[in-house]
């Protein structure tokens, strides 16, 4: 399981190992991406938390003015880690709009060619929240094949949930 890092009691009460330290570029900004693995497997599975100082190191998941950029950076950071470390999963399971751009990115961003063809499964827990953003946010995306912009579009906006529906291989 890969999730964003939030500054909550769980991260302070458990020990983590740094398994990846890299950098991503979003428009005119560069962000450090740290992937932390929980050491004890107390949850019964491997838990990886993605920490991006300035975006994914805050108290809460929601309520910030740059929420769209936060979740873009999370998805970009995860795919950068998997590509850089040559980790090719059989399936990427994407939940809600927070990871709805992953199926698009692995097929349309040359940076992630290593992951091209990985099967994706989408789960929608709440279709009311779609992560819709203005097209000017496209400048924060990793470079993608522009001719496929229609996969991102829903009623004139970038809509990560709609993108997931259009691009995922299967749903549950």
Please place each PLM-identified region on the residue numbering.
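Catalytic cores of nucleotide-sugar-dependent glycosyltransferases that transfer UDP/GDP/TDP-activated
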Residues: 1-172
């Amino acid at each position: 399981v890969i999730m964003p890092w939030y500054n909550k009691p769980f991260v302070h009460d458990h020990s983590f190992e740094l398994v990846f330290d890299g950098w991503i570029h979003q428009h005119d900004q560069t962000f450090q991406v740290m992937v932390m693995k929980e050491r004890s497997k107390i949850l019964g599975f491997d838990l990886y938390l993605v920490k991006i100082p300035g975006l994914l190191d805050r108290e809460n998941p929601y309520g910030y003015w740059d929420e769209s950029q936060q979740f873009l950076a999370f998805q970009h950071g995860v795919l950068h880690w998997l590509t850089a470390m040559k980790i090719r999963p059989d399936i990427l399971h994407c939940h809600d709009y927070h990871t709805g751009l992953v199926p698009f990115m692995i097929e349309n961003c040359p940076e992630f060619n290593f992951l091209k063809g990985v099967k994706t499964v989408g789960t929608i827990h709440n279709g009311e929240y779609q992560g819709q953003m203005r097209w000017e946010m496209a400048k924060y995306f990793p470079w993608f094949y522009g001719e496929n912009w229609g996969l991102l579009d829903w009623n004139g906006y970038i809509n990560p949930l709609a993108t997931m529906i259009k691009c995922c291989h299967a749903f549950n």
